[in-house]
């Protein structure tokens, strides 16, 4: 009787393990549309009237968050904000968020987290857009890597060789 009970427990355990394997084998978390590059430079200060844009080809099926790294030179006496947007190739807004500039930490990741997961954009061109609505300066700079000479982004009307330090998190 004891052998029969042990055998049933072993068979049930194996069944449960295989069930979980087959249920979750297709679900993987992909951390990064590309690896976040090591910062080698920073843009000029983000000021009113300047829009920073980085286009990229998305490879993540379900986008759940995007991280961007900022640098800062000073904290403000007046309140200022930063807006981060994610747009599709037709300039349709997929998600956006406004941040108080003083809440953004030096060389830490700032996360753009859509309310709902963004799906259906694998292989599509997406654009990150960063700007301020404040009339004063922000004390913030976007970090980027200038090691990739094939890539570029816009700082206002100026094309800068390199890639903004960002990553995309989601399910593949």
What do these predicted ranges mean?
Residues 90-99:
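Surface-exposed loop/edge segments in extracytoplasmic proteins
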Residues 2-90, 104-125, 131-172:
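Beta-sheet-rich sandwich/jelly-roll-like modules and their strand-loop junctions
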């Amino acid at each position: 009787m004891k052998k029969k009970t042990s055998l049933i427990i072993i068979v049930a355990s194996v069944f449960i393990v295989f069930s979980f394997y087959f249920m979750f084998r297709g679900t993987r978390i992909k951390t990064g549309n590309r690896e976040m590059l090591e910062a080698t430079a920073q843009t000029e200060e983000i000021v009113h009237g300047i829009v920073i844009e980085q286009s990229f080809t998305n490879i993540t099926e379900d986008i759940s968050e995007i991280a961007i790294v900022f640098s800062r030179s000073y904290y403000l006496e007046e309140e200022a904000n930063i807006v981060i947007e994610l747009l599709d190739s037709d300039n349709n807004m997929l998600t956006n968020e406004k941040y108080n500039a003083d809440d953004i930490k030096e060389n830490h990741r700032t996360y753009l987290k859509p309310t709902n997961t963004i799906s259906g954009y694998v292989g599509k061109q997406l654009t990150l857009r960063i700007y301020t609505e404040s009339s004063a300066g922000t004390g913030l700079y976007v970090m980027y890597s200038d090691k990739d000479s094939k890539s570029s982004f816009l700082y206002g009307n100026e094309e800068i060789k390199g890639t903004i330090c960002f990553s995309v998190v989601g399910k593949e």
